[in-house]
């Protein structure tokens, strides 16, 4: 900075004001590219320059210590500082710098318009001859500055929280939960996720309007991101919202610097909350740009998707029954001439269909508002006949949900569409879906489980853990998959763009014994789902389905004959039969499966068969057999006419779960020498395993968890030379392990929670690099063996009661 002394203008008789002003003008002209400086400020100073020359010439008559001349001197000094500082001004500081230039301009104008006249009056002098010259100069300067002055900061309303214009129902609980998390100092980033139409934006807008939140955060900014996020535009909006001029950023790095500078400036006045609404999948790097480490700065995101990198993820659930009812009543007033009972009955049927989805309740409610009782009845009847909410007359719901499907990767789209093949409100074991996908898409189970997780993270289904989340060995029975009915409809709607016979996926619903006419034509679907009610008599039409690779049969009757046309499905790879009735259904015509050369996976749930039925089919391609909640009756051993090792030559996995009347395994299972995984879980009556189990030399995984009556493992278990994982958790009656279990040199992992009464033979010390998962009490059995066992790892886990298990039944 130049001071007055260094310029030699501090003495009486010298040009005190004009000389410095001339230096500042010459310096400012060098920066031609920056108009506020080289043009606007220079123009102002050039008009002021003759006035300063006149003032300098009258030093003897004027008192340079008076207030007006001190302020003029300060203004010229500030101009000098501002001009010399310009080369060091960063691009993101130019808006702030421009406002500083504007203030200097205004102060110079003030001197000419007011201060100079006060000075003249005080000294009773006629400056500039006072023959109109001063007045003309000042007027000209005023007009010039009106044209050239930098506009005052404009605070544009670009990032304000939207005003709520909808009724708010059912958000009190989630509002309290979110508020608690947001006020938690340890939470810096928070995501509110849910399917579209569940009220995420409404909830967050209401949260931002909460007195406690407004009291905590001095600055609350709300930005809609959507599926095409533009980081630079959002930063520009934030700057303009706070009174800065619009800046054009050449890249995101510049915008990041601009955002940081803005936040650092704002946080001096108080904490900041930045809301990013409707952020889409794949925006992780976009979100990272906002995650600047500053105290008193938090980010709140709403999304259809989860973002695991954030501190906290809150999943907004559908409305509870009472709240859903209140919302429907708000939108749809009671039709005239309706009795209370009739009105309540219609309400309940509509609510069941809407299933707590706020947007669906609103759209349906608005469509029924002011309509007659017959219209209400007609709508309910049309749903019972198969009409979908996502079609006419409710296109709004589909428009809301469709982008979620469109955003999926191609692989996930196919998997999501397959979900429409299962019944609504069904709780599906993850293993059912993965088994089907393994054969349809030829991918490994770990990849396919990842697909399920991806769909769950996008709130297109829900993945509910039942147990300890152990699926490293390809065991996915401990997860349930559920899906909201509206999302299931979304999957089905995508297939309905084609005619029935041309669809890749096809759902056939048979009420009583009525078949649609199109069943008589050739069906080209590769995934076929057939559902029958409890009145179905198993009188099948002959259907031609040559391309079916996966068949899902949903039944409700107590007796069920498999359709003979299955024998013509030569491409069939996966068969899933699920009984939704209360008792196991007697299954007949099982023999129609024997002619299927490509059938690789069979899953039977809640049906009654004899265990001898399986080897008699002689399915040489079968890889996996799953029997869940099945009834077997008496176990038969007569397989003399069947060479089991040939009849089931490729069978690698048997999964028997919750089969309550299974007290012993059929002998033929011990003859399946190809078997690699044998899971017998939650079979409380199972008391023993056959001695011949030692024949299963290729067996790698043996699961016996929750077989509470099992008292011991046969000594022949030592013959399972390839066994690497043994699960005996919750086998409460198990008293000992085989004496020579130490011979199983490939055994690397034992899971034995709640087995503290089980005796460990001395030979276990021969097992090297063993990992044991158990509870604390069982862990004591192993701790004392650590000195004798090389690399023994004991992982004690707390036993938690998982209420999700109740969802299975």
From Swiss-Prot:
Pfam families xref list: LRR_1, NB-ARC, RPW8
Domain of life (superkingdom): Eukaryota
LRR repeats: 650-672, 674-696, 698-720, 722-744
Domain spans labelled RPW8: 1-150
GO cellular component: cytosol; endomembrane system
Domain NB-ARC per the UniProt entry, residue ranges: 153-280, 339-438
GO terms of biological process kind: defense response
Sequence positions that bind ATP: 194-201
Keywords annotated in UniProt: ATP-binding, Coiled coil, Leucine-rich repeat, Nucleotide-binding, Plant defense, Repeat
Gene Ontology molecular-function annotations: ADP binding; ATP binding
Coiled coil location: 50-86, 494-515
Transcription regulation recorded as keyword: no
Entry annotated with the keyword Chaperone: no
Entry domain remark: The LRR repeats probably act as specificity determinant of pathogen recognition.
Family assignment from sequence similarity: Belongs to the disease resistance NB-LRR family.
Role, per record: Probable disease resistance protein.
Protein name per its UniProtKB record: Probable disease resistance protein At5g66900
């Amino acid at each position: 900075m130049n001071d007055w002394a260094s310029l030699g203008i501090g003495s009486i008789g010298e040009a005190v004001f004009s000389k410095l002003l001339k230096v500042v003008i010459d310096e400012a002209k060098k920066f031609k590219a920056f108009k506020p400086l080289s043009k606007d400020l220079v123009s102002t100073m050039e008009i002021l320059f003759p006035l300063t020359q006149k003032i300098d010439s009258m030093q003897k008559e004027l008192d340079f210590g008076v207030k007006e001349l001190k302020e003029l001197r300060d203004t010229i000094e500030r101009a000098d500082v501002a001009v010399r500082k310009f080369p060091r001004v960063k691009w993101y500081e130019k808006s702030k710098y421009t406002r500083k230039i504007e203030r200097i301009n205004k102060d110079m104008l003030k001197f000419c318009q007011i201060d100079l006249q006060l000075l003249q009056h005080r000294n009773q002098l006629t400056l500039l001859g006072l023959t109109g010259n001063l007045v003309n100069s000042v007027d000209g300067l005023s007009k010039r500055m009106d044209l050239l002055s930098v506009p005052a900061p404009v605070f544009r309303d670009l990032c304000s929280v939207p005003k709520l214009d909808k009724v708010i129902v059912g958000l009190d609980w989630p509002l309290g939960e979110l508020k608690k998390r947001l006020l938690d100092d340890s939470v810096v980033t928070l995501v509110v996720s849910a399917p579209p139409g569940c009220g995420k934006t409404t909830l967050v807008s209401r949260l931002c309007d909460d007195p406690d939140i407004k009291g905590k955060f001095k600055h609350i900014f709300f930005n809609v991101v959507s599926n095409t996020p533009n980081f630079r535009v959002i930063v520009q909006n934030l700057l303009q919202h706070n009174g800065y001029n619009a800046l054009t950023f050449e890249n995101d790095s510049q915008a990041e610097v601009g955002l940081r500078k803005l936040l650092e400036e704002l946080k001096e006045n108080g904490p900041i909350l930045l809301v990013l609404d409707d952020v889409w999948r794949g925006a992780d790097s976009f979100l990272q740009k906002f995650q600047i480490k500053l105290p008193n700065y938090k980010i709140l995101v709403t999304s259809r998707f989860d973002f695991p990198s954030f501190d906290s993820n809150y999943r907004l659930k559908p409305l509870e029954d009472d709240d859903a009812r209140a919302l429907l009543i708000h939108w749809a007033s009671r039709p005239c001439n309706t009795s209370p009972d009739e009105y309540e009955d219609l309400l309940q049927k509509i609510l069941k269909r809407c299933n707590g989805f706020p947007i669906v309740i609103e759209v349906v409610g608005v469509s029924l508002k002011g309509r007659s009782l017959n219209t209400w009845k007609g709508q309910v009847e049309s749903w019972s006949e198969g009409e979908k909410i996502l079609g006419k007359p409710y296109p709004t719901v589909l428009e809301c949900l469709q982008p979620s499907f469109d955003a999926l990767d191609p692989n996930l789209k196919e998997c999501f569409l397959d979900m429409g093949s299962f019944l609504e409100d069904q709780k599906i074991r993850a293993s059912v879906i993965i088994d089907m996908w393994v054969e349809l898409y030829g991918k490994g189970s770990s990849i396919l489980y990842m697909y399920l997780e991806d769909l769950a993270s996008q709130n297109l289904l829900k993945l509910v853990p039942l147990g300890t989340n152990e699926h490293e060995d390809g065991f996915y029975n401990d997860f349930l998959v559920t899906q909201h009915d509206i999302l299931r409809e979304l999957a089905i709607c995508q297939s309905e763009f084609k005619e029935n016979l041309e669809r890749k996926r096809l759902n056939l619903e048979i009420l009583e014994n009525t078949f649609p006419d199109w069943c008589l034509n050739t069906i080209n679907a590769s995934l076929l789902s057939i559902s029958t009610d409890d009145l179905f008599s198993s009188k099948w039409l002959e259907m031609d389905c040559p391309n079916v690779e996966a068949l899902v049969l949903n039944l409700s009757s107590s007796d069920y004959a498999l359709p003979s046309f299955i024998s013509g499905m030569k491409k069939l790879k996966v068969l899933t039969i699920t009984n939704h009735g209360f008792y196991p259904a007697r299954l007949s015509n099982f023999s129609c499966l024997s002619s299927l050369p490509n059938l690789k996976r069979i899953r039977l749930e809640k049906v009654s068969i004899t265990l001898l039925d399986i080897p008699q089919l002689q399915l040489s391609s079968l890889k996996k057999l799953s029997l869940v909640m099945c009834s077997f009756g008496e176990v038969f051993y007569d397989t003399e006419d069947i060479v089991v090792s040939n009849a089931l030559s490729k069978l690698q996995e048997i999964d028997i779960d919750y089969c309550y009347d299974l007290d012993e395994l059929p002998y033929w299972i011990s003859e399946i020498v190809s078997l690699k995984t044998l899971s017998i879980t939650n079979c409380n009556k199972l008391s023993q395993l056959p001695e011949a189990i030692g024949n299963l030399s290729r067996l790698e995984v043996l699961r016996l968890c929750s077989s509470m009556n099992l008292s011991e493992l046969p000594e022949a278990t030592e013959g399972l030379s390839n066994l690497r994982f043994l699960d005996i958790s919750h086998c409460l009656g198990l008293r000992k392990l085989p004496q020579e279990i130490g011979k199983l040199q490939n055994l690397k992992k034992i899971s034995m929670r709640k087995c503290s009464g089980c005796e460990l033979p001395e030979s276990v010390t021969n097992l090297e690099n063993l990992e044991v998962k158990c509870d604390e009490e069982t862990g004591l059995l192993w701790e004392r063996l650590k000195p004798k066992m090389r690399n023994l790892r004991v992982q004690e886990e707390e036993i938690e009661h998982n209420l999700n298990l109740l969802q299975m039944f």
